């Protein structure tokens, strides 16, 4: 059975699965132009098969506990993704990534999903340190981190190559002890 985290009456997180390939590919295509302003990977999504391979890899990583990828559903419609892009089990640390369909932004959906995800894994004792890295010139993502109790720990200079330039990246973290 697919892991599900209930966020609210209308929002749920579903662990990535094979049946998400087609709607995920369609959502990426719909949002590709603006996604490429902040993320490098959308340029490499050329077909549904590319998405299938990514999903299959993430299913395996999810099962092994080295990453967790969740689809964000609003009333049974796929509207975005939130994930632990990398998990360090020994350190109980997870690096978080997220993106949302452009038409659903500005409604607090990512914040709600983020809170539900980190609390679910903090309460289980699996994770305690949560990290968000975002480009300095991505104000929306920086605001998500700050609004959700993450503390700016520093700025990584020229840490991310995107659109023919090296960009500075802010590193935010939040620690939640389950005790």
UniProtKB/Swiss-Prot annotation:
Q: What's the superkingdom here?
A: Bacteria
Q: Which residues form the N-acetyltransferase domain?
A: 11-172
Q: What EC class is this?
A: transferase
Mutant phenotype after disruption: No longer acetylates bL12.
Extract one GO molecular function annotation from the record: protein-N-terminal-alanine acetyltransferase activity
Q: Name one GO biological process term.
A: protein modification process
State its location(s): Cytoplasm
Task: Please give the Gene3D superfamilies that the UniProt record associates with this protein.
Answer: 3.40.630.30
What does the record give as EC number? 2.3.1.-
Reactions catalysed: N-terminal L-seryl-[ribosomal protein bL12] + acetyl-CoA = N-terminal N(alpha)-acetyl-L-seryl-[ribosomal protein bL12] + CoA + H(+)
User: Where does the signal peptide begin and end?
Assistant: none
The GO cellular component terms are: cytoplasm
User: Which keywords does UniProt give here?
Assistant: Acyltransferase, Cytoplasm, Transferase
Question: What does the protein in this record do?
Answer: This enzyme acetylates the N-terminal serine of ribosomal protein bL12, converting it into the acetylated form of bL12 known as bL7.
Question: What family, per the record?
Answer: Belongs to the acetyltransferase family. RimL subfamily.
Protein's recorded name: Ribosomal-protein-serine acetyltransferase
* Native source species: Escherichia coli (strain K12)
